[in-house]
């Protein structure tokens, strides 16, 4: 198994409901280490840039509006098969279809306000990490 890094967002809905600590606990309980984190209130331009791959999709405007509606937590997670591990912790995009005990089943209200984002592959993880963090902001946990 490979030690990987993945990118995660706790979205405005979950931040507003004070679920940050509970979500971090889930990451750590699953063996993922938080090696970088910060709270950010995205500008429209930042949100559009981050989600540029969806710019032609009908939900793009609503997504940008939601992601700029309040602060978010962005973090880098490190661990065994971190990309897949985080996706399993998050659950299905639609919380109505998410397995019990996943973040979206427990903390998301709808498919639009679904509490968390996680990279879907190593390549997207690298791109998304670089969007929010400089290399010197990553703090590998060696102890």
Curated annotation (Swiss-Prot):
<feature type="binding site">
    <location>
        <position position="104"/>
    </location>
    <ligand>
        <name>ATP</name>
    </ligand>
</feature>
<dbReference type="GO" id="GO:0005524">
    <property type="term" value="F:ATP binding"/>
</dbReference>
<feature type="binding site">
    <location>
        <position position="114"/>
    </location>
    <ligand>
        <name>ATP</name>
    </ligand>
</feature>
<comment type="subunit">
    <text>Homotetramer.</text>
</comment>
<dbReference type="GO" id="GO:0046872">
    <property type="term" value="F:metal ion binding"/>
</dbReference>
<dbReference type="InterPro" id="IPR034907">
    <property type="entry name" value="NDK-like_dom"/>
</dbReference>
<keyword id="KW-0547">Nucleotide-binding</keyword>
<dbReference type="InterPro" id="IPR001564">
    <property type="entry name" value="Nucleoside_diP_kinase"/>
</dbReference>
<keyword id="KW-0963">Cytoplasm</keyword>
<keyword id="KW-0067">ATP-binding</keyword>
<dbReference type="GO" id="GO:0004550">
    <property type="term" value="F:nucleoside diphosphate kinase activity"/>
</dbReference>
<keyword id="KW-0808">Transferase</keyword>
<keyword id="KW-0460">Magnesium</keyword>
<feature type="binding site">
    <location>
        <position position="59"/>
    </location>
    <ligand>
        <name>ATP</name>
    </ligand>
</feature>
<comment type="function">
    <text>Major role in the synthesis of nucleoside triphosphates other than ATP. The ATP gamma phosphate is transferred to the NDP beta phosphate via a ping-pong mechanism, using a phosphorylated active-site intermediate.</text>
</comment>
<dbReference type="GO" id="GO:0006183">
    <property type="term" value="P:GTP biosynthetic process"/>
</dbReference>
<protein>
    <recommendedName>
        <fullName>Nucleoside diphosphate kinase</fullName>
        <ecNumber>2.7.4.6</ecNumber>
    </recommendedName>
</protein>
<dbReference type="GO" id="GO:0005737">
    <property type="term" value="C:cytoplasm"/>
</dbReference>
<dbReference type="InterPro" id="IPR023005">
    <property type="entry name" value="Nucleoside_diP_kinase_AS"/>
</dbReference>
<feature type="active site" description="Pros-phosphohistidine intermediate">
    <location>
        <position position="117"/>
    </location>
</feature>
<dbReference type="GO" id="GO:0006228">
    <property type="term" value="P:UTP biosynthetic process"/>
</dbReference>
<keyword id="KW-0546">Nucleotide metabolism</keyword>
<keyword id="KW-0479">Metal-binding</keyword>
<dbReference type="Pfam" id="PF00334">
    <property type="entry name" value="NDK"/>
</dbReference>
<feature type="binding site">
    <location>
        <position position="93"/>
    </location>
    <ligand>
        <name>ATP</name>
    </ligand>
</feature>
<keyword id="KW-0418">Kinase</keyword>
<keyword id="KW-0597">Phosphoprotein</keyword>
<dbReference type="InterPro" id="IPR036850">
    <property type="entry name" value="NDK-like_dom_sf"/>
</dbReference>
<feature type="binding site">
    <location>
        <position position="11"/>
    </location>
    <ligand>
        <name>ATP</name>
    </ligand>
</feature>
<feature type="binding site">
    <location>
        <position position="87"/>
    </location>
    <ligand>
        <name>ATP</name>
    </ligand>
</feature>
<dbReference type="GO" id="GO:0006241">
    <property type="term" value="P:CTP biosynthetic process"/>
</dbReference>
<comment type="similarity">
    <text>Belongs to the NDK family.</text>
</comment>
